[in-house]
């Protein structure tokens, strides 16, 4: 009987530990592979997600590079505004409702980036490198390229 309890305890602990190690956000690369980029909902989520990662990047570089931090926060706000515009057009939401929803979602995604960035920092002393966060940044940078 003690062996069964011990085995159960070990299994439960390993499940908990694996859950605690999991990233809070799914990689944008994986997300976009599973979604249709032509759909408004996918575009809206992508804009919110990119807004969150630029806000996160702004906070990371704030002390070392105030100019880049300011640029990142401007990009973040522009992406969030574009998501609000799409929500008003595609989902027929009122402007105030769309703004509130977009800001709430960005805060959630931003918090996830903070938590995952801290985990990555503990692992390899980088907020971005070696994690999905750097891949997300590359994807999001393509949205802001000037043609």
Specify the residue positions occupied by each region the protein language model found.
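Short N-terminal segments immediately surrounding and downstream of signal-peptide cleavage
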Residues: 21-41
